[in-house]
Amino acid sequence: MFPMVTEFMNYGQQTVRAARYIGQGFMITLSHANRLPVTIQYPYEKLITSERFRGRIHFEFDKCIACEVCVRVCPIDLPVVDWKLETHIRKKRLLNYSIDFGICIFCGNCVEYCPTNCLSMTEEYELSTYDRHELNYNQIALGRLPMSIIDDYTIRTILNLPEIKT
């Protein structure tokens, strides 16, 4: 008879323990009910990137002196710089500049070490394409500035979301 009583007591303790665990989980669920949602509806709402965000690289052709510092500091030797030596003025003239963003790791070394500041990081992060060859940007594509998310009236930025007072 005693083993049956102890089994019944163990069953009762396990039931109370299970009810307590369920109650703790339910309390956590209720505590999150008053918070703002974390998920955003991406195509229609976009996050505003931080000031130091490493997006697509912007290139200013007129400032470049073809010193190739960007190629030397790049861990994967990515920027392709074509230049021609002008012998009468003893300076390099830049012919072509291109970066393949399919290979780029967005480390920012080229931007940091550029002596003339002809390279800068933009806030553009939508670089997806159907063909990987479209990710190879030449100096014309690198020279285009992206449209700012803040200026785009068709997209509601995350700062305009209503706040829930708790």
Swiss-Prot record:
> According to its record, how does it sit in the membrane?
Peripheral membrane protein
Q: Name one GO cellular component term.
A: chloroplast thylakoid membrane
Class in the EC hierarchy, top level: translocase
Which reaction(s) does its UniProt entry say it catalyses? a plastoquinone + NADH + (n+1) H(+)(in) = a plastoquinol + NAD(+) + n H(+)(out); a plastoquinone + NADPH + (n+1) H(+)(in) = a plastoquinol + NADP(+) + n H(+)(out)
Coiled-coil residue windows: none
Q: Which GO terms describe its molecular function?
A: 4 iron, 4 sulfur cluster binding; iron ion binding; NADH dehydrogenase (ubiquinone) activity; quinone binding
Listed A to Z, the keywords are: 4Fe-4S, Chloroplast, Iron, Iron-sulfur, Membrane, Metal-binding, NAD, NADP, Plastid, Plastoquinone, Quinone, Repeat, Thylakoid, Translocase
A Gene Ontology BP annotation from the UniProt entry: photosynthesis, light reaction
Which cofactors does the annotated protein need, by name? [4Fe-4S] cluster
Question: What does the UniProt entry say about where the protein is found?
Answer: Plastid, Chloroplast thylakoid membrane
Q: What is its EC number?
A: 7.1.1.-
* Comment on bound cofactor: Binds 2 [4Fe-4S] clusters per subunit.
Binding-site residues, [4Fe-4S] cluster 1: C64, C67, C70, C114
Q: Where does [4Fe-4S] cluster 2 bind?
A: C74, C104, C107, C110
Q: Where is the signal peptide?
A: none
Role: NDH shuttles electrons from NAD(P)H:plastoquinone, via FMN and iron-sulfur (Fe-S) centers, to quinones in the photosynthetic chain and possibly in a chloroplast respiratory chain. The immediate electron acceptor for the enzyme in this species is believed to be plastoquinone. Couples the redox reaction to proton translocation, and thus conserves the redox energy in a proton gradient.
Entry's family note: Belongs to the complex I 23 kDa subunit family.
Q: How does it assemble?
A: NDH is composed of at least 16 different subunits, 5 of which are encoded in the nucleus.
Q: What is the recorded name of this protein?
A: NAD(P)H-quinone oxidoreductase subunit I, chloroplastic
What is the organism of origin for this protein?
Tridax balbisioides (Coatbuttons)
What gene, per UniProt, encodes this protein?
ndhI
